[in-house]
């Protein structure tokens, strides 16, 4: 049975349009609260990013949870991985994040974490959806008795607790003293946290894009727009730059030359560091979108590599299936299960900094063992949300077949719909730049014409 509202990363959409409305948020809170209240402490944590719409959705969810008899603890603007960590620390039934991650301010979303700090599984989401459907269509939302209504409280020291958690994943014998780091918080949830983590570990920190106003989150900044970070690294002659996205669950780097170090290269750096110390347990989990260069570089070290479906939840599932510790995506979602239960941009960045310090080399030098193959990704925006019918058309299928025949064993093609936006992603990878670009545009044209 497929999920109706939960995409690859919870519920997401444009604010004010279904399902990102106060009514939906309230009924989702009630449905989730009813499911979660059947066992556990009957308390949930709610965190959010810096979008102005977060206040509206937070209040609506509070009402829904209270109606279901579930208490709510508010932790304010907080990175997504912080909510996962704190939900586990406070023994809550669940953590709720109100965020649309790297999307523009006019989008928002809602996702849940279990009390073990991992994302809800498909079965739990389906159970919540079944109740939600009744609340939406049959007016089946029922309030508990007045004396059983949930209460709301604030946790004032949440940021400090999470800062200490992040610092605790960095070895005590190492210090960032002597490193000049530029941190781009994307005007997002980590604006008051990330700079303090690096400063307290000894680094000289230049903080940019750290003044959220409710509408500037991810606006030409952060992990999806690295231009301002590249410029700042060069202007300040920094050792490196770190970019988080709006909810700080992904991270990208810029080396001292201003060159981008993406999620695939971060995975290589972490695997290489563990391998050099004889600490690599198992292999690495990437996704269907992971650059072939990562797979080849890991193969040189005899490190196994498998591809999961796109989405960090599927990377986590594959890691648990294999018993491995390290996985992630080129977009900067990095999973290091020995340190955190979900993708954590700050924690992942600290592991990279650890690798830099222990190698006594620059970031540019330690990534040099991996050569990325030319990869072109074209996002084709759809007029309608019916991506499945477009992918099923004969013309699109024929275009893919022809491209694969042309590339032969020198490349690969991947066509997939976005789980969060009305997009079809066309990815082509091969040993030749021109060939890669040409074939990607050929398939993208077929998608647009379908």
From Swiss-Prot:
UniProt entry tagged with the keyword Calcium: no
UniProt cross-references to PROSITE patterns, sorted A to Z: PGM_PMM (PS00710)
Residues of the active site: 101 (phosphoserine intermediate)
Biological process annotations from GO: carbohydrate metabolic process; peptidoglycan biosynthetic process; UDP-N-acetylglucosamine biosynthetic process
Keyword tags: Isomerase, Magnesium, Metal-binding, Phosphoprotein
PTM comment, free text: Activated by phosphorylation.
EC number assigned by the record: 5.4.2.10
Cofactor: Mg(2+)
UniProt xrefs under InterPro entries: A-D-PHexomutase_a/b/a-I, A-D-PHexomutase_a/b/a-I/II/III, A-D-PHexomutase_a/b/a-II, A-D-PHexomutase_a/b/a-III, A-D-PHexomutase_C, A-D-PHexomutase_C_sf, A-D-PHexomutase_CS, Alpha-D-phosphohexomutase_SF
Pfam families: PGM_PMM_I, PGM_PMM_II, PGM_PMM_III, PGM_PMM_IV
Catalytic activity of the protein: alpha-D-glucosamine 1-phosphate = D-glucosamine 6-phosphate
Cellular component, GO annotation: cytosol
Residues carrying Phosphoserine: 101
A GO molecular function held by the record: phosphoglucosamine mutase activity
Cofactor annotation remark: Binds 1 Mg(2+) ion per subunit.
The keyword Phosphoprotein belongs to this UniProt entry's keyword annotation: yes
Annotated TM spans: none
Highest taxon, organism lineage: Bacteria
First-tier enzyme category under EC: isomerase
Residues involved in Mg(2+) binding: 101, 245, 247, 249
HAMAP family from the UniProt entry: GlmM_B
Family named by the database record: Belongs to the phosphohexose mutase family.
Protein function: Catalyzes the conversion of glucosamine-6-phosphate to glucosamine-1-phosphate.
Protein's name in the database: Phosphoglucosamine mutase 2
Gene this chain is encoded by: glmM2
């Amino acid at each position: 049975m497929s999920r109706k509202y939960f995409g690859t990363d919870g519920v997401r959409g444009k604010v004010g349009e279904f399902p990102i409305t106060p009514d939906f948020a309230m009924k989702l809170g009630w449905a989730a609260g009813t499911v979660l209240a059947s066992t556990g402490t009957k308390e949930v944590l709610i965190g959010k990013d810096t979008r102005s719409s977060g206040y509206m959705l937070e209040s609506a969810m509070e009402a829904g949870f209270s109606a279901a008899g579930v208490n709510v603890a508010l932790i304010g603007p907080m990175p997504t991985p912080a909510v996962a960590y704190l939900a586990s620390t406070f023994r809550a039934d669940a953590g709720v994040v109100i965020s649309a991650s790297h999307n523009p301010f006019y989008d928002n979303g809602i996702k849940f974490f279990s009390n073990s700090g991992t994302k809800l599984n498909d079965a739990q989401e389906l159970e919540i959806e079944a109740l939600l459907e009744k609340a939406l269509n049959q007016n089946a939302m029922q309030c508990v008795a007045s004396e059983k209504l949930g209460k709301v409280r604030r946790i004032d020291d949440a940021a400090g607790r999470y800062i200490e958690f992040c610092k605790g994943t960095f070895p005590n014998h190492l210090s960032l003293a002597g490193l000049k780091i530029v941190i781009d918080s994307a005007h997002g949830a980590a604006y008051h946290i990330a700079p303090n983590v690096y400063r307290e570990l000894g680094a000289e920190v230049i903080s940019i894009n750290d003044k959220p106003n409710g509408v500037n989150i991810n606006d030409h900044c952060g992990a999806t727009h690295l231009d301002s970070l590249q410029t700042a690294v060069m202007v300040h002659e920094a050792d490196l730059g770190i970019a988080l996205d709006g909810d700080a669950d992904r991270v990208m780097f810029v080396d001292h030359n201003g060159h981008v170090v993406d999620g695939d290269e971060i995975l290589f750096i972490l695997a290489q560091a563990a391998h050099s110390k004889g600490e690599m347990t198992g292999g690495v989990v990437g996704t269907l979108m992971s650059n072939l260069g990562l797979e080849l570089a890991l193969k040189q070290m005899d490190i196994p590599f498998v591809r999961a479906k796109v989405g960090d939840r599927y990377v986590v599932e594959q890691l648990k299936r294999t018993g491995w510790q390290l996985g992630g995506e080129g977009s900067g979602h990095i999973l290091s299960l020995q340190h955190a239960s979900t993708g954590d941009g700050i924690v992942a960045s600290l592991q990279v900094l650890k690798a830099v310090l222990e190698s006594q080399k620059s970031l540019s030098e330690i990534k040099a063992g991996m050569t990325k193959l030319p990869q072109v990704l074209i996002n084709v925006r759809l007029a309608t949300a019916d991506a499945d019918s477009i992918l099923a058309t004969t013309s699109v299928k024929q275009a893919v077949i022809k491209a694969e025949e042309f590339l032969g064993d020198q490349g690969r093609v991947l066509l997939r719909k976005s789980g969060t936006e009305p997009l079809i992603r066309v990815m082509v990878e091969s040993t030749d730049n021109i060939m890669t670009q040409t074939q990607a545009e050929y398939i993208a044209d077929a998608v647009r014409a379908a």
